[in-house]
Amino acid sequence: MKKLATLTALAGALTMAVATAAQAESKSSSTDNTATPCVGDKCVKTKAAEGKCGEGKCGADKAKSAEGKCGEGKCGADKAKSAEGKCGEGKCGSK
């Protein structure tokens, strides 16, 4: 019984690997960003005007946010600190 389970798992993994590779190949050919203009008998590939993500061009024209994200030490920096300490610090109720 162990051999059957092992072979079934191996066959499933192999099927998924082949299906993923075939899907990636068909997807890359359908989303090709190159144009092929033909003049006479010569066809020349030209690059697309916009680069792909991962090349450092995606979102380069977007303005950066003036306010930082939480976790960078900027979240709530403009808020005034409380004059009274928290209870447990020895300041609670003592004047």
From Swiss-Prot:
Region (Disordered): 55-95
Biased composition (Basic and acidic residues): 55-89
Keywords: Signal
Signal peptide feature range: 1-24
UniProt-recorded name of the protein: Uncharacterized protein HI_1601
Source species of the chain: Haemophilus influenzae (strain ATCC 51907 / DSM 11121 / KW20 / Rd)
